[in-house]
């Protein structure tokens, strides 16, 4: 990103008018950090000639909370809740990355197939939450309000599932390193997830019918914010932004890296052709259907590995998590009595925005020595100066909506 001083120097290179004219018609605008279309506290210093953007300088840091530093002051168990506060539109996938890093440092994990399946199910529910909000707010920025009401109906159903299993609608604190999820398994939970997976496709179809062939929607998105294949291979972009260029990059289907239960599921990766905003919209919309299919297949697999009557929370005599031994182990773990050997580990997941990663340095204590967060939205935000130059100022809202930026994980 350019600093404001270098931006002021480059302004002098822009001339408007006749060859003999020495006057400069340059207008510098501040877009944000309180603009409703900035998707958070983003400030853009824009240099325009007429309505065409010639220079773009993003400024971040207005939401900095020092998460990477705060984690160093808490035990491995207690630090997991900080991950929920980063990208608050897809909370569970980020906590999953942290759990993978800590479990790698433990060198052994007692997680059963049931827990891996449940993590996969709730990761896909978080992806649906993210894509629904991304498409709805993007359409709202363009001028379509109906998508917001349709999308939030399904988001409400998912948040009711979160509330059922954890008591919280957004920051669930559901995943913890090396901890199973058997205690949340009930007949009612699986029935709720199954009903949602069958009924949600109606909303996705309505969004497709309303937007795909909409002339205004296509005019505002097609050819806007084109990311070339060279940029996708030479930068650190990921997720729908990278896949819109034709780059097949998805951590769920990696040959050298697998997590959750994705290795046993059939995953379809959707790629774009032109790399513009419309391709990114189509990829997110198709991933909504794909996530629903993965949830349904995971429920089928889960039914083969579990006897619900044994792990039902209502059957107190059969629930192992209600025994005193499990309670003592949980207290010891939460108090930080578990030490991790000196190691440098990492955990990566495919979140709704792209590859989210946690790099962790352990030093034989009960808390991290150092933690680094790889935010996909931060990587995508660096594309704005290239994508915005040459477009009209009205297209900035389209660009921001198509790269899907949330500043909880950008500033962190």
From Swiss-Prot:
Top class in the EC scheme: translocase
Catalytic activity: a ubiquinone + NADH + 5 H(+)(in) = a ubiquinol + NAD(+) + 4 H(+)(out)
Recorded GO MF terms: NAD binding; NADH dehydrogenase (ubiquinone) activity; quinone binding
Keywords noted in UniProt: Hydrogenosome, NAD, Oxidoreductase, Translocase, Ubiquinone
Compartments in which it is found: Hydrogenosome
Pfam families tied to this protein: Complex1_49kDa
Listed name of the protein: NADH-ubiquinone oxidoreductase 49 kDa subunit
